Curated annotation (Swiss-Prot):
This is Plasma membrane ATPase. Its EC number is 7.1.2.1. Residues 994-1023, 1067-1131 are annotated as: Disordered. GO terms for cellular component: plasma membrane. It comes from Dunaliella bioculata (Green alga). GO terms for biological process: proton export across plasma membrane. It comes from the Eukaryota. Keywords: ATP-binding, Cell membrane, Hydrogen ion transport, Ion transport, Magnesium, Membrane, Metal-binding, Nucleotide-binding, Phosphoprotein, Translocase, Transmembrane, Transmembrane helix, Transport. GO terms for molecular function: ATP binding; ATP hydrolysis activity; metal ion binding; P-type proton-exporting transporter activity.
């Protein structure tokens, strides 16, 4: 590699000579400090010049040096797959598998391992597909770079940059590679150089932007805060300063909020399971004196413990939640909202305040200039003014204002032919102007054209005092009509010998509101989101736009905000304090980026989840600070880098769609969370209680099969059709735990009642044609006496030795030489009656297990339909995938319940060809061909076997349906007590049910219908404006925002100014739709109350109803404001 000659003095910025240029495969990063060598030496070292590379040279270098990106952080797919089996829940399942194989229970071991593998395969497949799809959609967000190729500036993907490329970097760009700045374009020798300001805090820790001049270096990843300059690339990819730093921290790993939530829920489940495991073992080994001598034959108690351990573990939880999030993020990306931080989906679901910029989000950002409204303030005519405007534009950057000025001048070709830009001073947020230095080719005349904020342009004019009144008056007129004002000035010369600026004109820029913004804002408010306009434009422009959009006009300029923050009570405008003012008002105008940051912080301190939109480099701090930073379409690289969500489609509607999508994702995740907690409690308490009280066994194989059917089907929840919550969402583990516990205990009660009814009563035998499953001795004693006589003859003594049976006598050595009919008892040989009781208990218990299995499976998965909605579950249509999952899972469970396992597992102390295992009506048992039964007296090491319960599956379905009916009322009671989703604050359960009935015929994404006033929450006596503010509205606001209500009856009409009385008239008629702090400006004319025969009217532009007189004498015209009239030309 090339070496630098020795002899360079320490601190020198010049290299005497470079032995050889950069060669193939080299970058020179480690050999040369580019900050200390001259530009000429850098060009020699990189083997290039200021005119950049040709396409062929760039392609060759790309092959040699590789792409300008860090190495892919993708992990080995095998390790990713295995990772799905490495978490606390999987560890518990793996422990169960180890116990199974240690006890030589191969079948359970295989099924448990199979369940783990199925879960991992589904997770790997679904998440991989979602990740690939998201990467494909985010390819459009790949950083771009403006590079000089073949002598022309072209835009390419930054990944294709190579050492030696000359690029153009400007305000808002993220520096795409390590570069060395070239001299300013068009700069003359001796002219003072304007520095670039580059924010490299993320790389170097500098708190303030660094000033950079010609020859200085800028690192990849830093952002341009001011200026525009060409630069030569000297390092790309891993060889950049950022690349080497990233390599050092690549091992760090942050725990997401979802992972934290899963850890908490996993802990709840595991603690519950372990408690029951301890109780079961203590009772069975203690009270029931079970023994454990090792091996499968000698320790059935441990196998029974696996039922609680395997059944209670929500093994599918990481899969369902992560896949739900991944698939949801993919769907958001398809709808124009690309998630850069996955946990932002959860925060977007909880967002209750959205601070939106005006330009491009609430408006179209398609500027136009009405030439008839141009205001000349000098000696030029309108055509000449428009020509100067076109000359001031830099069309390379394609900024909206530059483009509208350029395109508004019809004779653009003459400008290209007759003039040349020799220098361009770009816009920056501090100066608020641009300056173009122009050369008239024919005459050699040099002049400069300045455009920008009217106040700034006016201040530079030589006759500013004379023009001040005219300019301010016209600015107010423009603002009253919703126009932004742009100042234009010119001066002869290039500025070296002083400048005499002459202001030429004020140009009106109109940016029309989006056609769907008004409806979208209404929808936002109906979804519990307060929209605040945060604009850099003049206050009057903001208010006029707000009126067009139906927003509230309670807006203030940043000057008022600053004074109020500093304790000036006169600027509070009736609010109690500054915090309430920020929280309650509809927006702020004439704001700077630091104001946005402060607004976000104040709202967050008031317990709001705040979303902030932005597009510029100076919006980055506020975007980073916000809970949900949203970079709008066509945002700068810096804004995109700071945002959590990047929009690819313009407009507020995309944000609302993303919020609704995020809430749906959240709804799916909380649905599964409630379900899985409920199932843990249900399995633990159901089988734990029956085992502890009755020393009852349940085969592990059944619980594993149930987990395969039901937990596998839960993946469908990630694609379920849900209705987004009307209120912001957040994880409330306490509520999830309480609701899951109540559901689980209720389902436990349903199974317990079924077990008691089937095994301790004769209800089913008496009321249905089904045989009895009653296992009580009082029932079995007479039945077995009849059964023994029916099988062996009426003269046989039922209590005689088992040796009386030819079949069984062959299986006992003790029966050798036994004389039938002697009635002699044989030691160690059970009696006929005792064997009959044992066989019947074995048979009925085995069939009861199939019944319980089927009922637990059906009622458990049916719970999903209850917890997925706040309304009536039978009327809220679920997704097709959810129905199909339930159908196939329960068809499998039903078939399994009918046919069972034919007596598997076989009893350890067994007799073949059972003699007394008929149904209770003395018919042979179906699906029990083996006839293997346990020997009487071996119950202490009894193996839990399974035989199909046949027609009892109908009982399981009917029983589950009956108990299902009460789940919705229980849910509503819990919603009321816990105020889930604002249930208690916003509606009664009857209203919730009615609303769910209304919704089921609608498309699930829209819910366009208003369900309350236009404010955040429905009005009530303590909150008559329906505000979502944490603080009570001040009296001044109530007085200012109250509207009259006209109550009409046949004989009289009364007008009420009392908000409380308004509430008595009718819920929907309250204050019309108030133009309150968070409401719309007014209500549509003559809206009829739904709850009473009243007509509610609201003011719109100062008018009431059709043709009626105003309530007050205030005019709809906006008066000139006392505040500073400086308006910015971009937000």
């Amino acid at each position: 590699m090339a070496d630098i000659k020795e002899g360079v003095e320490e601190g020198s910025v010049k290299v005497d000579m470079i032995k050889e240029p950069l060669t193939q495969g080299d970058t020179g990063v480690d050999e040369v400090d580019f900050a200390k060598i001259t530009l000429d030496d850098a060009f020699k070292y990189l083997n290039c010049n200021k005119h950049g590379l040709s396409s062929a040279e760039a392609a060759a270098r790309l092959q040699q040096h590789g792409p300008n990106k860090l190495p892919d952080s993708s992990r080995n797919p095998v390790l990713v797959f295995l990772g799905y089996m490495w978490n606390p829940l999987a560890w518990a399942m793996e422990a169960a598998a180890i116990i199974s194989i240690a006890l030589l229970d191969v079948a359970d071991f295989v099924l448990i391992v199979g369940l783990l593998l199925i879960n991992a395969i589904i997770s790997f497949y679904e998440e991989s597909n979602a990740d690939k799809a998201i990467k494909a959609l985010t390819a459009a967000l790949a950083p771009k770079a403006m590079v000089v190729r073949d002598g022309a500036i072209v835009t390419i993907d930054a990944v294709n940059l190579v050492p030696g490329d000359v690029i153009l970097i400007r305000l808002g760009n993220i520096v795409p590679a390590d570069v060395k700045l070239l001299e300013e374009e068009g700069a003359d020798e001796g002219e003072q150089e304007a520095p670039m300001q580059i924010d490299q805090a993320a790389l170097t820790g500098e708190s303030l932007p660094a000033k950079k001049f010609t020859g200085d270096v800028a690192f990849s990843g830093s952002s341009i805060k001011q200026g525009e300059r060409h630069a030569v690339v000297y390092a790309t990819g891993v060889n950049t300063f950022f690349g080497r730093a990233a390599a050092l921290i690549s091992g760090t790993n942050n725990v997401s909020n979802l992972q934290t939530v899963m850890n908490k829920m996993s802990a709840i489940c595991i603690v519950t399971i372990l408690l029951w495991v301890v109780v079961e073992l203590a009772v069975q080994f203690g009270h029931y004196s079970h023994e454990c001598v090792g091996g499968r034959e000698g320790c059935p108690t441990l196998l029974n413990m696996l039922v609680v351990l395997v059944g209670g573990i929500p093994i599918a939880m990481p899969t369902v939640l992560s896949v739900t999030l991944a698939l949801g993020a993919y769907k958001l990306a398809r709808e124009g909202a690309i998630v850069t931080r996955m946990s932002a989906v959860e925060e977007m679901a909880g967002m209750d305040v959205l601070c939106s910029d005006k330009t491009g989000t609430l408006t179209l950002n398609k500027l136009s200039i009405d030439k008839s409204m141009v205001v000349p303030v000098g000696n030029m005519g309108v055509d000449e003014i428009m020509r100067m405007g076109a000359l001031s534009a830099n069309t390379v950057t394609e900024e909206p204002i530059d483009m509208v000025l350029w395109e508004s001048y019809p004779d653009r070709e003459t400008i290209k032919r007759d003039y040349k830009h020799t220098k361009y001073f770009p816009f920056n947020p501090n100066d608020k102007i641009t300056i173009a230095t122009c050369l008239e080719i024919a005459t050699g005349r040099v002049f400069r054209v300045l455009k920008g904020s009217p106040q700034v342009v006016l201040a530079k004019a030589w006759n500013a005092a004379e023009l001040d009144a005219t300019v301010n008056q016209k600015m107010v007129e423009f603002a009253n009509r919703g126009f932004r004002a742009l100042g234009l000035a010119m001066a002869d010369g290039d500025g070296k010998d002083g400048t005499k600026w002459e202001m030429l004109a004020l140009l009106p820029l109109f940016d029309p509101p989006r056609h769907d913004t008004k409806e979208t804002i209404e929808h936002c408010q109906n979804q519990g989101i307060q929209v605040k306009m945060i604009t850099g434009d003049h206050l009057l422009i903001g208010k006029e736009t707000a009126k067009m959009l139906g927003m509230g006009t309670e807006m203030f300029p940043s000057e008022v905000m600053i004074k109020a923050r500093n304790g000036d009570a006169s600027q509070l405008h009736g609010y109690k304090n500054f915090v309430e003012m920020v929280e309650t008002c509809n927006g702020f105008a004439q704001v700077f980026p630091e104001h946005k940051f402060e607004i976000v912080k104040i709202l967050q301190d008031s317990n709001h989840v705040v979303g902030m939109t932005g597009d510029g480099v100076n919006d980055a701090p506020a975007l980073k600070k916000a809970d949900v930073g949203v970079a709008v379409a066509d945002a700068t690289d810096a804004a995109r880098g700071a945002a959590d969500i990047v929009l690819t489609e313009p407009g507020l509607s995309t944000i609302v769609t993303a919020v609704i999508g995020a809430r749906k994702i959240f709804q799916r995740m909380t649905t599964y969370s409630k379900y899985t907690i409920a199932m843990t409690f249900r399995i633990c308490f159901t089988f734990g209680l029956i085992t502890v009280i009755y020393d009852w066994y349940f085969p592990t194989i059944l619980i594993v099969i149930m987990a395969v059917f039901n937990d596998g089907a839960m993946i469908a929840l990630s694609k379920d059709r849900v209705v987004a919550s009307k209120t912001p969402n957040s994880w409330n583990i306490t509520n999830i735990f309480i609701m899951g516990m109540v559901y689980g205990l209720y389902l436990t009660l349903s199974t317990w009642a079924l077990y008691q009814t089937a095994t301790k009563t004769t209800f089913f035998e008496d009321k249905t044609p089904l045989h009895s499953l009653n296992d009580q001795y009082s029932v079995l004693q007479p039945w077995c006496e009849d059964e023994v006589r029916a099988k062996l003859g009426q003269t046989i003594d039922p209590y005689a030795s088992l040796c009386e049976s030819n079949s069984y006598a062959k299986q006992f050595d003790e029966c050798e030489g036994y004389q039938k009919g002697s009635g002699v008892q044989v030691e160690d040989v059970p009696t006929l009656h005792a064997q009959c009781v044992t066989e019947q208990r074995y048979l009925r218990g085995a069939m009861t297990r199939s019944l319980i299995y089927t009922q637990v499976s059906i009622s458990g998965q049916a719970l999903v339909f209850v917890v997925r909605t706040a309304g009536y579950s039978l009327m809220e249509r679920a997704g097709t995938s959810t129905y199909l999952a339930f159908f196939f899972a329960q068809v499998g469970a039903t078939l399994f319940g009918i046919f069972g396992l034919g007596g598997f597992e076989k009893p350890r102390h067994q007799l073949e060809d059972c003699q007394f295992c008929d149904y209770s009506f003395h018919e042979p048992v179906d699906w029990f061909d083996s006839g293997i039964v346990p020997e009487s007296g071996t119950e202490s090491d009894f193996t839990a076997s399974v035989i199909g319960c046949g027609g009892y599956v109908i009982v399981a379905w009917i029983w589950s349906a009956i108990w299902y009916v009460l789940l919705d009322p229980i849910k509503w009671i819990l919603f009321w007590i816990l105020n889930e989703e604002g249930f208690r604050d916003t509606m009664s359960w009857r209203e919730s049910t009615k609303r769910s009935l209304d919704r089921r015929s609608k498309d699930d994404i829209g819910d366009k219908e208003f369900t309350g006033p236009s404010g955040m929450v429905p009005a009530n006596y303590s909150n008559p404006l329906g505000r979502a503010s944490m603080s009570k509205p001040v009296s001044a606001v109530l007085d200012r925002k109250s509207a009259s209500l006209v109550a009409i009856n046949r004989n009289s009409m009364t007008v009420s100014q009392d908000p409380n009385r308004a509430l008595n008239i009718g819920r929907r008629s309250m204050i019309g739709r108030p133009s309150g702090p968070v409401g719309r400006t007014s209500m549509p004319l003559g809206r009829i109350s739904r709850t009473s025969n009243t007509l509610s009217t609201g003011s719109k532009d100062g008018q009431i109803g059709r043709g009626s007189k105003p309530l007050n004498s205030s005019s709809a015209e906006i008066k000139p404001d006392k505040y500073d009239f400086a308006s910015t030309i971009r937000e």
